[in-house]
Amino acid sequence: MPKMKTKSGATKRFKKTATGFKHKQSFTSHILTKKSPKRKRQLRGTKLIAKSDVASIKRMTAC
């Protein structure tokens, strides 16, 4: 059986860390005027992937 190809989109979106995978928070690119400063502040930075999604991310990124 041939090797599975990695999903190139997933490779760009998720980075492997020591404890799991991190990703950029969504809802931060446009239409920011209606979002409160608190909401925008909390959307900053990166978040860790939920434990239930780690297996599927591993399959997509071949880590």
UniProtKB/Swiss-Prot annotation:
Gene3D superfamilies attached to this UniProt entry: 4.10.410.60
Gene Ontology MF term list: structural constituent of ribosome
Key word Magnesium present: no
InterPro entries documented for this protein: Ribosomal_bL35 (IPR001706), Ribosomal_bL35-like (IPR021137), Ribosomal_bL35_CS (IPR018265), Ribosomal_bL35_sf (IPR037229)
Region (Disordered): 1-22
Swiss-Prot/TrEMBL GO biological process terms: translation
Cytoplasm is among the record's keywords: no
NCBIfam families: rpmI_bact
The family this protein is said to belong to: Belongs to the bacterial ribosomal protein bL35 family.
Name of the protein: Large ribosomal subunit protein bL35
Biological source species: Marinobacter nauticus (strain ATCC 700491 / DSM 11845 / VT8) (Marinobacter aquaeolei)
